[in-house]
Amino acid sequence: MRFSSPHFRNVAIGAAAVLWLAGAAQAAEVHVMISGGLSAAYNALVPEFEKATGNKVITAYGPSMGTTVNAIPTRLDRGEPADVLILVGYALDDLVKKGKATSRVDLVNSKIGVAVKAGSPRPDISTADAVKRALLAAKSVAYSDSASGVYISTEMFDKLGITADMKDKAKKIPATPVAEIVAKGEAEIGMQQISELKAVAGVDIIGPLPESLQKVTVFSAGIASASKEPEAGKALIKFLASPAARETIVNSGLEPIEGTAK
């Protein structure tokens, strides 16, 4: 998927340059830890920021929560370098409470989607009852180990009255995009943030969960308490929250939260 155009690149570079001149005096290495929900748009936008500012952005990827080796809280506990943290909003709040982060800027809203292997039959998911039937009929179901998966496994299955039915067929997928598992044929149905599903080839996204089952997740950015380049980090956050980033964010399947760039 193409996230940029010549016009967008010019606007983005100009916006990033203005932000940088306002926020920092010299080029720096900016260490970022980011979870999967915003990563596709982020990966498309970072080169524009680097061109405009001369900064080098070094990125580590991992879930917003949990204890896996790549999880952002685990990385911070290991003392890995971090200037900017981009993850689920309430997970960032937890890091602020623990003294690991110092701020929060809400960037996007993200909805959960449903996917099947490319070319496979597309079950009806238009209503809660339809989703229930699709899940019960599926031989295997996959969900993530981050925010969407926590909701699906602890709330949505219970709401549908299928927790017992899902016990053996539904699997939490750690440290791997759910869409990759679906594309390989290892799960018949996959559920994760739409932006994460869109980033993987080999799947068909049926659509978002119906509103009665939907769980909108806010992805936010903050400065790490141990940051060595807080001003450069703030400039990056301002750029990601600016109008220049909007087209790329929307194309990745996310909804920008307006008015957060400061």
Predicted features by range, described:
Residues 1-13:
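Bacterial N-terminal signal peptides that target proteins for export
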Residues 28-70, 74-81, 89-97, 102-110, ...:
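Exported/periplasmic ABC-transporter solute-binding proteins
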Residues 23-27:
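Sec/Tat signal peptide C-region and signal peptidase I cleavage site
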Residues 11-22:
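Bacterial N-terminal signal peptides
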Residues 86:
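Phosphate-/polyanion-interacting regions in eukaryotic proteins
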Residues 4, 15-17, 34:
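Terminal low-complexity, poorly structured segments
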